[in-house]
Amino acid sequence: MKVAITNRQKRHPIGTRRLRKVAETILGALGYPDSELSVVITGDLGIRRVNRDYLGKDRPTNVISFAMGEGDFGDLNPDVLGDVIISADTAAREAEEAGIAFWSRLCFLLLHGTLHITGYDHERSGEAEARRMEAKEREIFALLENGGLV
């Protein structure tokens, strides 16, 4: 499996090797051990730009995912899953509001975005699918915690 981590912000220190291990564990737990994933950590300005340009929403958000398996050429290379873009600024604010560690929130957002790329949806597929996604989040996050990654 190949996980590319790009950190485009400096405000919040991030251990990219450790984050890569988190991503690899998530992919393994989801049954994608031979897949490729790109993870970009940016700030609110960067994610706002992506949100505006690609999703038509001119505001920052916590995580955006782009699945490569969608569209006309989705089956071209099924091992390339897609991109997860996370705002470290938003993650830090959400962590502070929830009274949790920044690293924990960052890892959860990586998990959440990766679930979207692999077909899970909590926004458009109804309540049953949202519950299924939340259950998978709890299951894999517990795996990360038990493995000392969070």
Curated annotation (Swiss-Prot):
Residues the record lists as binding Zn(2+): H112, H116, H122
Biological process according to GO: rRNA processing
The keyword Cytoplasm appears for this protein: yes
Keyword Lipid biosynthesis: no
MF terms (GO), sorted A to Z: metalloendopeptidase activity; RNA endonuclease activity; zinc ion binding
Role: Single strand-specific metallo-endoribonuclease involved in late-stage 70S ribosome quality control and in maturation of the 3' terminus of the 16S rRNA.
Family of the protein in this entry: Belongs to the endoribonuclease YbeY family.
Entry-linked NCBIfam families: rRNA maturation RNase YbeY
Name the UniProt record assigns to this protein: Endoribonuclease YbeY
Primary gene name: ybeY
